[in-house]
Amino acid sequence: MAKASNTAAQRVRKKVKKNVAEGVVHVHASFNNTIITITDRQGNALAWATSGGQGFKGSRKSTPFAAQVAAESAGRVAMEYGVKNLEVRIKGPGPGRESAVRALHGLGIKITAISDVTPIPHNGCRPPKRRRI
């Protein structure tokens, strides 16, 4: 019985944090929420944060301030991995697009490139009908 507990103790290893100098920030800004994912060059996720995960609920999730708080949270975790330079890829029409980039710049991370990768349909699916309030 003692051997079983010894092998269980040996299996537990401390996770080694990899040191990544350059990364890519994927900012997905929808009308309802903002999702920020920081990956390495190969696309492996290092850190992520959302406006809803930062405690904002309902219509407050879709504010620029909520996107700023989420970007700061993800940026701090990425800095623990040694990230110094980031390339930003923005997707979506939401209000948190610009404030997320400004928040990352404010943390002291160098932004090397900003690109808009919003998918634009070549007359694909029919969009939802207009809201009448």
From Swiss-Prot:
InterPro entries: Ribosomal_uS11 (IPR001971), Ribosomal_uS11_bac-type (IPR019981), Ribosomal_uS11_CS (IPR018102), Ribosomal_uS11_sf (IPR036967)
GO terms classed as biological process: translation
Keywords in alphabetical order: Ribonucleoprotein, Ribosomal protein, RNA-binding, rRNA-binding
GO MF annotation list: rRNA binding; structural constituent of ribosome
Pfam families in alphabetical order: Ribosomal_S11
Superkingdom of the organism of origin: Bacteria
Gene Ontology, cellular component aspect: ribonucleoprotein complex; ribosome
Keyword Chloroplast in annotation: no
Transmembrane segments: none
Classification via PANTHER family: 40S RIBOSOMAL PROTEIN S14/30S RIBOSOMAL PROTEIN S11
Family according to the record: Belongs to the universal ribosomal protein uS11 family.
Role noted for this protein: Located on the platform of the 30S subunit, it bridges several disparate RNA helices of the 16S rRNA. Forms part of the Shine-Dalgarno cleft in the 70S ribosome.
Subunit structure of this chain's protein: Part of the 30S ribosomal subunit. Interacts with proteins S7 and S18. Binds to IF-3.
Protein name, as recorded: Small ribosomal subunit protein uS11
Lineage of the organism: Bacteria, Pseudomonadati, Pseudomonadota, Betaproteobacteria, Burkholderiales
